Amino acid sequence: LNQLVIKMRFPSTFMSIAFRIRAAMELHQSTFLFCFLFLFAASTADLQRFPLPATSDGSLAFLVVGDWGRKGLYNQSLVAAQMGTVGEKMNINFVISTGDNFYEDGLTGVEDPDFGDSFSDIYASSGLQKRWYSVLGNHDYRGDVEAQLSPLLAEKDSRWVCLRSFLLDGGFVQFFMVDTTPFVDKYFTKPGHSTYDWNGVLPRDEYLKNQLQEVDTALKQSTATWKIVIGHHTILSAGQHGVTKELLEHLVPILEENNVDMYINGHDHCVQHIVSSASGIHYVTSGGGSKAWRGVIKEWNPEEMKYYYDGQGFLSAKVTEEKANLMFYGVSGSVLHAWNITKENERKVFIA
């Protein structure tokens, strides 16, 4: 059954879909919906699409956290506790993870106890019992990538949804989830002592070409008021990792051409808000889920740099047709930085 669900990911006929759905029904009931959406999306669109639930007040509320999976250490548990408090207060619809979900080397398989020790047991509060939509980070690629991508993990925790690249469709807002690790040259040319799992990525050039085409096509076809792109790696950042030149070269032109509102990432272990003077895109880092305090802050144009905090924290957001309200929270629960973006004044920033 494991091989059936994991390996047969791209059916060529609806008969094979029906067969796989029947097999998926033998799993725990809580995983069936995810399995169905996973299979259906893979067979009907280039960029897999997941609908977000409609809300009565016409808004979507969510949290974003990255670089977290350390079995509760390095203040991960404190961040999780504050996320639970904020999540319950906001009655969030879902959580987004910007990657590096399990340190230091991803998961070893679907039975790896780190999944429970670093995810299920840590984010256990009632305010966080919503879907978690996750992208992969470079540390996740050091383990068994297929384990994190497997829908069998949803049998252990029905919140878990992780794919390479996919689309979350909330109608007036869409999230374009991008697998950024394969873009970075050094993981291929200078991996050091790390071993990366490139199954499903090679040949690399073809993988990157297809991913860029899928994201570009999805953005062009989008009629959403808000277009938000999620990836692990920084594009603009004053943190330790700084600018990722490969994304600046290949992904940014697509973001700018398609009027993307925000790019949200992890990778740098901080919370950070930059507004590009060239495009007006908001580059938001939420990578403070656990280990932080790198002590590296590079010089940056003060007109672009709206906020930088070299510590742990997470992002909250509430989005309507007209406005996006965003806040960074720290481990004490205090609001570190808040801002609004309105659509009446395209991408104009109001700092609270």
Give residue ranges: language-model regions.
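A short C-terminal boundary segment appended to hydrolase-like catalytic domains
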Residues: 305-352
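Non-catalytic terminal accessory segments
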Residues: 9-12, 17, 26-31, 291-292, ...
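Cleavable N-terminal signal peptides of Sec/SRP-targeted secreted and luminal proteins
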Residues: 20, 29-44
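Residue-level marker for buried hydrophobic side chains located in beta-strands
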Residues: 62-64, 95-97, 134, 229, ...
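Extended active-site neighborhood of metal-dependent phosphoesterases/phosphodiesterases
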Residues: 46-48, 54-56, 103-226, 242, ...
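Active-site flanking residues adjacent to catalytic metal/cofactor-binding acidic residues
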Residues: 66-67, 99-100, 178, 231, ...
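N-terminal active-site segment of His-dependent metallophosphoesterases
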Residues: 42-114, 205, 209, 217, ...
